[in-house]
A protein has these predicted regions:
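Mature catalytic core of soluble alpha/beta enzymes
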Residues: 2-226
């Protein structure tokens, strides 16, 4: 809970500091926030805010969470992980597409991005209440369970199979981006032309600011203190 409170404060700070100039046009923006995908998800609409647009966008984010969250026992990704080394699991078009894209990025990056780092994420307790540093021996063992080339996709059957028992798919590094893309698409379909989708710091803008100018998005310097 402490981590979520810190995330909430950070998101609020980002929204106030980066986007306060958007209200200068005289249009009153509306925002809604929910805890989804393990973080604070906030949508701000500047031109045509409507309850229907907010509802549809957050429902789409929730749908993606229910498919891809590693923290939900009955999510598709959790079922894929439980079936590692045993059998292929049929999944939705959303999940198949995101895993397919994750593997493509893994290949292009030479493994710098790897969606099968789940065992290491779990061992380090990243995102949890009690993070720790595993021993070198534990890390060496868990690395044997990491390898994007051992994820087998069947496009015809739309299934995912992890070849070795103990492998864990973790889409945390890509699912929020996909959810932001989908939320923006839904907002556009509802006639929204100016909005910000902020999923725990994964920021996506829709259209231009209401005064026609470009958005300015601040990026934290990784070498400086926050």
């Amino acid at each position: 809970m402490k981590q979520l409170r810190r995330i909430g404060l950070l998101v609020a700070f980002i929204v106030v500091v980066l986007f306060s100039s958007c209200t200068k046009s005289g249009v009153e923006p509306r925002s809604q926030s929910f805890l989804m995908l393990g973080t604070v998800c906030r949508i701000t609409i500047y031109d045509k805010p409507s309850d229907a647009a907010f509802k549809a966008a957050f429902e789409r984010i929730k749908e993606i969470e229910e498919h891809m969250s590693i923290h939900m026992d009955e999510s598709e990704i959790s079922r894929v992980n439980r079936s590692a080394g045993k059998e292929a699991v049929p999944v939705s078009e959303d999940t198949f597409l995101v895993v397919q894209k994750a593997l493509e990025i893994a290949r292009l990056s030479g493994g710098a991005f790897d969606p099968t780092v789940g065992p290491l994420v779990e061992a380090w307790g990243i995102g949890g209440e009690s993070p720790r540093r595993p021993s070198d021996e534990e890390i060496a063992h868990l690395l044997t369970l990491v390898g994007y080339d051992r994820v087998i996709l069947d496009e015809e059957e739309q299934t995912i199979f992890l070849s070795d028992t103990g492998m864990v798919l973790d889409l945390g590094a890509i699912a929020k981006g996909y959810a932001a893309d989908e939320a923006a698409r839904v907002l556009t379909e509802h006639g929204v032309g100016s909005a910000i989708v902020n999923l725990g710091g994964n920021v996506l803008t829709v259209g231009l600011k209401v005064d026609g100018s470009l958005w300015r998005i601040g990026i934290q310097d990784p070498e400086q203190e926050r």
